[in-house]
Amino acid sequence: MATIAFSRLSIYFCVLLLCHGSMAQLFGPNVNPWHNPRQGGFRECRFDRLQAFEPLRRVRSEAGVTEYFDEKNEQFQCTGTFVIRRVIEPQGLLVPRYSNTPGMVYIIQGRGSMGLTFPGCPATYQQQFQQFLPEGQSQSQKFRDEHQKIHQFRQGDIVALPAGVAHWFYNEGDAPVVALYVFDLNNNANQLEPRQKEFLLAGNNNREQQMYGRSIEQHSGQNIFSGFNNELLSEALGVNALVAKRLQGQNDQRGEIIRVKNGLKLLRPAFAQQQEQAQQQEQAQAQYQVQYSEEQQPSTRCNGLDENFCTIKARLNIENPSHADTYNPRAGRITRLNSQKFPILNLVQLSATRVNLYQNAILSPFWNVNAHSLVYIVQGHARVQVVSNLGKTVFNGVLRPGQLLIIPQHYVVLKKAEHEGCQYISFKTNANSMVSHLAGKNSIFRAMPVDVIANAYRISREQARSLKNNRGEELGAFTPRYQQQTYLGFSNESENEASE
């Protein structure tokens, strides 16, 4: 009996350890940034000539457009990324779907509501309706609707989309919603082929497809219910055959973005309640971050799906100036969003950086230590140069709004805003991406002894000291005050302040 009891206790202890390990991996703040759980072996990739991308093809729906970047291009395939841009018109509903790969959504413009349906989580929103029936029957019938939390999104929001989690978006504003989606095909959550697959729960993709600069093709795709037998489906769901046919989307030509004529009737708490809920959610988030950073009893480490998964925040605004990581009043601001600030990114294994450069401001040259980067221009123009390990310029051009540039891991990049300034967002293929700067505070030059710099570049110690310290305490975004005139030194330009 003692042996059996000891065996059961050992099994119980192992289960607790496994449970804690899996939850800590997903939600714990102490994540190793040098480790990136992306699959896919090494392949021969040629990044010797980068190019700026724009959407290659578009699919029109009843109330919007989906634009696809060239997923067959070698640069997208080598980085394991897939990018689309969606435009949802007012009162447009992006029908529920889920994907085989995790992703991030950046709201370029517009506002609306969205829902993410996490499996196994309780329905926390409850609403009662009163339905009036025809004469001769009882005058009204009450029924109650329950569903998971509805989130409101606005311009500048980042939305995390874990693989296999159903979601929908609705435009409740007066202007179109424009959103950029970036998916990670090489994430370990994807156990299918390294290709983006959307599983539609409603609607279809039987719409005409326009190839930019090419011929028109037909894009075909049904929702998941269309593949089931009608009788089996109606029996499984407890509905009649007509409803089952509607679920299958037969003869439905609206596409994947449909128009809701009278608008969605959504249950939302009042503004004061929303603020209170947001505050409680932030407190809970901070609480379990502290919880996993401290030593606790094993029995409290695996305390249920609801606390760690169902209440996790799925949306965060990256354009809020108060959230900026670095700010220079004469150059701009940089905001980074990683799993430390946004724990759900441990599931998605992506991160984002929002950069707002003022007039003629320049970024310190840098490289991405542990991730590829996808740079999308939101406003303005930027002069960009990218250099490979061979010291060759693989990109040298001006990026304009709507263009996307893939910057491979370790390639050095230099960006300078044009006279109207520049705003861009970059998506990184690591939940805790890191960059290494060449100039300014906390840079490579600052970390090196003066003699190392002087001998490496055959310059005097005074020149090496100037090279090491001439940017003072500036970090990231630099004011446009230095212009190289000769090999020996630098001279000041006029310092013009630029407003956002």
Swiss-Prot record:
Disulfide bonds join C45-C78, C121-C310. Pfam families: Cupin_1. Keywords: Disulfide bond, Seed storage protein, Signal, Storage protein. This is Glutelin type-B 5. It comes from the Eukaryota. The gene is GLUB5. PANTHER family: 12S SEED STORAGE PROTEIN CRB (PTHR31189:SF35), OS03G0336100 PROTEIN-RELATED (PTHR31189). Residues 1-24 form the signal peptide. Hexamer; each subunit is composed of an acidic and a basic chain derived from a single precursor and linked by a disulfide bond. GO terms for biological process: seed development. It comes from Oryza sativa subsp. japonica (Rice). Belongs to the 11S seed storage protein (globulins) family. Residues 50-245, 316-465 form the Cupin type-1 domain. Coiled coil: none annotated. Seed storage protein. InterPro entries: 11S_seedstore_CS, 11S_seedstore_pln, Cupin_1, RmlC-like_jellyroll, RmlC_Cupin_sf, Seed_Storage-Functional. The keyword DNA repair does not apply. GO terms for molecular function: nutrient reservoir activity. The keyword Transferase does not apply.
